[in-house]
């Protein structure tokens, strides 16, 4: 006997229903996380490369590590400025894709490479010519200036290829393809480690080069990164469609806009990096132990900061695409989703660091005097992770939206005019020491985040009003 069973009509209909489509908020959230993940890995790779140099050189010789650190300090200013000045490549590429004009991205890339050439070779010349004089003028002791001069010159030689690698990485990120850049950054880290192990202690034949060997390892790794990225871009199947091989017509407004975005980002980077570096001076007025403790806090914060940097780049791409597509609602949605996500991530980092602060501090030092300063400073640092993360993401979102100078002015006010004087007042006259420096960073981070979020909201209101008037 055959038994025929039938499914109820409602159940059958339910079983055949297609998957519910995602709403725009969930779609943007998934896209943000997809873009941010590889970018975070890429930015972490930059930090690991510098950390590798320091570890290998430090194990070889503490004296050589001092030379390496002094040579790296002035070169890092040029590196940071270069990254900021070339942000326009990422933003303009995303805008072209959002406008449905992928061929224009090739013109953005070519302009970026020319600009990178000028920046790279100009920075190399300035650093090589004036860097040694700067070291001598600082009145450094124990032969630091003399020992750091040659590594500094070698570091300067890698600035042109580094600028090229930044352009290629930003261009791929603007195309919403951050994965290759992240993968190649970590391959460059492998090259850097191998070159360090070969050149610094002088194994397998070459003489031990110490700090100079670490600088040459950085040169080799940066060159390998630039070459790998260039080969990848040239061999992309879409390269011709994207205009990579086509000489673009001269477009002065686009050239100016691309550089203008970079000017604002470069100035912001300068203000922020200089302000945080300037805290070392105030800590030096407190005590040598305060300098060491602040260095630990800054190092931990810098590692955590790579996540907001990655989310900021992803946000710039998404807001830039919406800007190119003339989609104000898309810009608003992408921005506020990113602000919420990074705010939560910042809070989570603080909640994670607070109970583990002892282990983190012990990874750096076991000195009781240093630990007495590091532990409360790490507790205070937990309070600025969220606002600091929000401000960097909001600044990038505003630049992608066409607001170039508001973030720069905000960073000038917050970091140059508020943080430094407040840190000095709290640390020295008020007697709060290192904790006063950390409190000033907390206040400044909330101030910058508040300014930038308010400006983003003002643009939301402006665009909504314009849409209502047009209707």
From Swiss-Prot:
It is a multi-pass membrane protein. The chain crosses the membrane at residues 38-58, 69-89, 114-134, 152-172, 197-217, 266-286, 289-309, 334-354, 370-390, 409-429, 434-454. It is found in: Cell inner membrane. One of its GO terms (molecular function) is xenobiotic transmembrane transporter activity. One of its GO terms (cellular component) is plasma membrane. Its main location: membrane. GO terms for biological process: monoatomic ion transport. Keywords: Antiport, Cell inner membrane, Cell membrane, Ion transport, Membrane, Transmembrane, Transmembrane helix, Transport. InterPro entries: MATE_fam (IPR002528), MATE_MdtK (IPR050222), MdtK-like (IPR048279). PANTHER family: FMN_FAD EXPORTER YEEO-RELATED (PTHR43298:SF2), MULTIDRUG RESISTANCE PROTEIN NORM-RELATED (PTHR43298). Belongs to the multi antimicrobial extrusion (MATE) (TC 2.A.66.1) family. Multidrug efflux pump. This is Probable multidrug resistance protein NorM. The lineage of its organism: Bacteria, Pseudomonadati, Pseudomonadota, Alphaproteobacteria, Caulobacterales.
